[in-house]
Amino acid sequence: MLLLAKLPEAYAPFDPIVDVLPVIPVLFLLLALVWQASVSFR
Protein backbone atom coordinates (compact mmCIF):
# COMPACT_ATOMS: atom_id res chain seq x y z
CA MET A 1 0.00 0.00 0.00
CA LEU A 2 3.08 2.28 0.01
CA LEU A 3 2.68 2.88 -3.72
CA LEU A 4 -0.88 4.14 -3.22
CA ALA A 5 0.29 6.49 -0.47
CA LYS A 6 2.69 8.15 -2.93
CA LEU A 7 -0.03 8.88 -5.50
CA PRO A 8 -0.88 12.56 -6.10
CA GLU A 9 -3.86 14.10 -4.32
CA ALA A 10 -5.76 14.02 -7.62
CA TYR A 11 -6.11 10.24 -7.23
CA ALA A 12 -7.52 10.50 -3.70
CA PRO A 13 -11.18 10.00 -4.84
CA PHE A 14 -10.16 6.71 -6.48
CA ASP A 15 -8.83 5.17 -3.25
CA PRO A 16 -12.13 3.38 -2.44
CA ILE A 17 -12.12 1.84 -5.93
CA VAL A 18 -8.56 0.56 -5.45
CA ASP A 19 -9.56 -0.85 -2.05
CA VAL A 20 -12.50 -2.75 -3.60
CA LEU A 21 -10.59 -4.13 -6.61
CA PRO A 22 -9.00 -7.13 -4.77
CA VAL A 23 -12.44 -8.22 -3.52
CA ILE A 24 -14.04 -8.48 -6.99
CA PRO A 25 -12.43 -11.84 -7.98
CA VAL A 26 -13.54 -13.32 -4.64
CA LEU A 27 -17.11 -12.15 -5.28
CA PHE A 28 -17.04 -13.75 -8.74
CA LEU A 29 -15.73 -17.00 -7.22
CA LEU A 30 -18.50 -17.03 -4.61
CA LEU A 31 -21.07 -16.27 -7.30
CA ALA A 32 -19.78 -19.17 -9.40
CA LEU A 33 -19.89 -21.56 -6.42
CA VAL A 34 -23.47 -20.54 -5.54
CA TRP A 35 -24.53 -20.88 -9.19
CA GLN A 36 -22.97 -24.34 -9.49
CA ALA A 37 -24.60 -25.41 -6.22
CA SER A 38 -28.03 -24.18 -7.32
CA VAL A 39 -27.69 -25.94 -10.69
CA SER A 40 -26.48 -29.22 -9.20
CA PHE A 41 -29.15 -29.30 -6.48
CA ARG A 42 -31.90 -28.55 -9.00
From Swiss-Prot:
SUPFAM superfamilies with a match to the protein in the record: Photosystem II reaction center protein K, PsbK
Compartments reported by the entry: Plastid, Chloroplast thylakoid membrane
Removed propeptide positions: 1-5
InterPro entries for this protein: PSII_PsbK, PSII_PsbK_sf
Lineage: superkingdom: Eukaryota
Recorded coiled-coil stretches: none
Record keywords: Chloroplast, Membrane, Photosynthesis, Photosystem II, Plastid, Reaction center, Thylakoid, Transmembrane, Transmembrane helix
The keyword Thylakoid belongs to this UniProt entry's keyword annotation: yes
Gene Ontology CC, one term: photosystem II reaction center
Ranges that cross the membrane: 17-37
Single biological process term from Gene Ontology: photosynthesis
Record's bilayer topology term: Single-pass membrane protein
Keyword Membrane: yes
Family under the similarity heading: Belongs to the PsbK family.
Subunit structure, as described in the record: PSII is composed of 1 copy each of membrane proteins PsbA, PsbB, PsbC, PsbD, PsbE, PsbF, PsbH, PsbI, PsbJ, PsbK, PsbL, PsbM, PsbT, PsbX, PsbY, PsbZ, Psb30/Ycf12, at least 3 peripheral proteins of the oxygen-evolving complex and a large number of cofactors. It forms dimeric complexes.
Function comment: One of the components of the core complex of photosystem II (PSII). PSII is a light-driven water:plastoquinone oxidoreductase that uses light energy to abstract electrons from H(2)O, generating O(2) and a proton gradient subsequently used for ATP formation. It consists of a core antenna complex that captures photons, and an electron transfer chain that converts photonic excitation into a charge separation.
Descriptive protein name: Photosystem II reaction center protein K
